[in-house]
């Protein structure tokens, strides 16, 4: 798995190389910032976008001054982020309080609180304390565009629970309850949720209504919808087009030039895994993962580790059959999803009809094949195919063995 290999490799490098703070900045942090489009000077100089060793006041030093390792600037001269670096062998968390002091100083001097990053070059933490989030480990740095939106959210975010649900899209009681539970969880500063809904009860509709609510409330600018097959990708694309007016990009189908303007991206897991690193870690604000089960975790779990977004898993797998890994991936205790609407309840409330198992067989499977019992039409058909009907004399067990052999069963399974 690519993301896991990268993380494992960097952590193994940590044990092999002991870079001091200056080397950590030059060899690791500078390179990662450049990869996200930041204009970083090759030496210790500063650029309009990235200041190094930026002096601030109000520090607990004899002079009252301190130097921020990095400050990332917006076009308006306001700080978007501050980065505190430690040498590679130190715990990244050792820089947490120092980073906060620098953020306090920048807020006091500019009127805008920057997003906080602290790192040892290998482990990177983001701390968006202005929005009430606790620090969390992330895979890389945000691009300028993603940081700008993170800052903007402080002004435009509305209360999710007071933002109406589009009941034309998801108006059934259990659908609205699922959306409300997710939004309550997000409002409580959790970043992941898992919905269990029986097949046919409208998981895609819940996804669309949830996406619209987060877009309307300023909680999301760009949304990624993941599914496991091209047929589902097409269905989801049609459904989003029908119920939203947002610019849509269907990965593997839409023209590539539409990708940069899209607010909703729909992709299969295999399609997204090929080139997800084209996006920075903060590009998407919400990821909705359809058909979330163990195989998705095993094959595509890196997508959820790479992107620093709110994440919602959707599955029709009954609660008692959901794996621990799936529950953990979406931040839920084992067998305790955020919302659950099982098949039995859907049938009881007449939102689904009970299924019936119908067993079909054929005369040949029941009675075998005997020339004396063939119709004139069957005899004529066999003769047209060059088969002598008189050679056919098989009992039911022989027919079953010939048709339902082990290889056939394996192919069906």
Regions found by a protein language model. Give the residues of each.
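ATP-dependent helicase/translocase motor core
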Residues: 1-222, 227, 231-246, 260-264, ...
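Short glycine-/polar-rich loops that comprise or flank the Walker A/P-loop
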Residues: 78-80, 110-114, 219-221, 283-284, ...
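Conserved nucleotide-binding/hydrolysis micro-motifs of P-loop NTPases
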Residues: 88-90, 122-125, 230-232, 270-273, ...
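Amphipathic alpha-helical transducer elements in NTP-driven molecular machines
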Residues: 92-100, 266, 286, 294-297, ...
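Phosphate- and divalent-cation-binding pockets in alpha/beta enzyme and binding domains
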Residues: 235, 274-275, 299, 322
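Short acidic low-complexity segments
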Residues: 249-259
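SF2 helicase catalytic motif II
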Residues: 279-313, 317-318
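Interdomain helical connector at the RecA1-RecA2 junction of SF1/SF2 helicase-like NTPases
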Residues: 324-413
């Amino acid at each position: 798995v690519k993301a896991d290999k990268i993380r494992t490799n960097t952590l193994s490098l940590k044990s092999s190389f002991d870079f001091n703070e200056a080397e950590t900045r030059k060899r690791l942090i500078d390179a990662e910032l450049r990869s996200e489009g930041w204009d970083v000077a090759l030496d210790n100089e500063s650029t309009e976008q990235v200041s190094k060793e930026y002096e601030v006041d109000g520090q607990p030093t004899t002079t009252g001054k301190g130097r921020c390792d990095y400050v990332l600037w917006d076009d308006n001269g306001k700080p978007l982020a501050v980065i505190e670096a430690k040498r590679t062998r130190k715990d990244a968390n050792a820089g947490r309080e120092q980073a906060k002091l620098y953020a306090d100083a920048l807020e006091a001097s500019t009127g805008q609180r920057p997003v906080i990053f602290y790192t040892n070059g290998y482990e990177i933490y983001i701390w968006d304390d202005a929005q009430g989030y606790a620090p969390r480990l992330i895979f890389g740095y945000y691009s300028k565009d993603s940081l700008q939106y993170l800052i903007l959210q402080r002004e435009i975010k509305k209360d999710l629970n007071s933002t109406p649900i589009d009941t034309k899209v998801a108006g059934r009681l259990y659908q609205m309850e699922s959306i409300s539970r997710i939004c309550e969880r997000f409002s409580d500063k959790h970043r992941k949720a898992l919905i269990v809904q029986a097949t046919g009860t409208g998981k895609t509709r819940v996804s669309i209504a949830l996406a619209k609510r987060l877009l309307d409330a300023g909680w999301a600018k760009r949304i990624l919808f993941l599914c496991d097959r091209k047929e589902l990708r097409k269905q989801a694309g049609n459904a989003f087009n029908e119920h939203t007016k947002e610019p849509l990009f269907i990965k593997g189908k839409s023209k590539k030039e539409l990708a940069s303007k899209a607010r909703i991206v729909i992709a299969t897991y295999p399609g997204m895994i090929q080139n997800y690193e084209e996006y920075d870690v903060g590009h998407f604000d919400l990821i909705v993962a359809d058909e979330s089960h163990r195989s998705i975790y095993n094959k595509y779990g890196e997508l959820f580790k790479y992107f620093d977004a709110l994440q919602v898993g959707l599955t029709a797998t009954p609660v008692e059959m959901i794996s621990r890994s799936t529950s953990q991936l979406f931040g839920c205790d084992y067998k305790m999803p955020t919302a659950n609407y099982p098949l039995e309840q859907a049938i009881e409330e007449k939102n689904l009809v009970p299924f019936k198992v119908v067993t079909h067989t054929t005369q040949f499977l029941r009675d075998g094949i005997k020339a004396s019992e063939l119709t004139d039409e069957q005899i004529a058909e066999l003769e047209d195919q060059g088969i002598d009907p008189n050679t056919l004399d098989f009992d039911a067990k022989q027919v079953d063995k010939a048709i339902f052999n082990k290889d056939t069963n394996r192919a069906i399974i």
